[in-house]
C-alpha cells in the first residue's frame, strides 16, 4: 500500500510562495453551494461555527467538498473548550480561526491546544480524516499536522492591542485576521469604517505580520483588493454566499417590477422583516 500522508494545505502553499489567498465565506448549510465556490477557483472556503447555526456534520460535508477540488476549508470555531478547536482539524479542515482573542495569554492557550509537540500539547487521536484513519504513523501525524495545518486568530477588540506584537510573533499562529465589524462597535464607533483607530489597527496588523512573517487577513472586495494587498494583506475574504444570493434574487425581482410593478407586494407587506422596499 502506498504511504499515506496528510493533505497539504493550499493556503499555506500559496502563502509560503508569496502569493495572495482569496476566500469565500459560507453561511448556508448546502454542500452544493460550497462546491460552486470551490469550482469558481477560491483558495479557501470559510465555514463558521461561531455565528452560523450549522451542525458539525454540515461542516464535515463542506470540508469534503473542498478537498475534492484541492480547496482548503477554514472553520471559525466557537469559543469553548479545546474540543471545539480540534474537532474541525480532525475532520481535516486545513485551518481554524479563533474569534475575539483578548490577550497574549488567550493566544498562548490557543497554541497550546491546537499544536502538537514540541509547539503545544494538542490532544492526540489520529483515527480521523486528518490522520487517514490511523493510516499515518504517530510521529509523522504530529509533524505533518504542525506543518500542514494553519491556526488563525481574530483581532476584533481593543483589549489585545497593547500586546499585539507579542501575539503576532507567537510561534504556532499563522494568520492574524483583523475584523473591522466587531472592532468598530467595540471602540464605540459602529460602522464608521473611516474611524482613525480602525485604519490605524488595520495598518498595524499588516505591518506586524510582515515583520514577523505571518499572514495578515481581513475582509475585502474587488474594489479595495489591490489597496489591501499593497498594505500587506495576504489573505482576503472576498464574498459570502448569502450576500450573493440576496443580491441575485433582489436584482431579478427589481427587473420583474419594471414589467409587473406590484410584484412582491404581498411579501413586502406581510414578511417577518416588514416592508423591505
Feature-to-residue mapping (PLM):
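Hydrophobic faces of well-ordered beta-strands that scaffold small-molecule active sites
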Residues: 22-26, 45-47, 73-77, 96-98, ...
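Conserved N-terminal beta1-alpha1 strand-loop-helix module at the mouth
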Residues: 1-73, 80, 112, 151, ...
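Glycine-rich phosphate-binding active-site loops on the catalytic face of alpha/beta enzymes
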Residues: 95-109, 176-185, 234-252
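Alpha-helix-loop-beta-strand connector modules within alpha/beta enzyme cores
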Residues: 10, 55-90, 112-120, 143-147, ...
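Extended, intrinsically disordered, low-complexity segments
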Residues: 2, 9, 241-244, 248-277
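Catalytic cores of alpha/beta
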Residues: 35, 39, 75, 80-94, ...
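Conserved anion-binding
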Residues: 83, 95-171, 265-277
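N-terminal amphipathic alpha-helix/helix-capping segment at the start of soluble metabolic enzymes
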Residues: 1-27, 135-147, 203-211, 268, ...
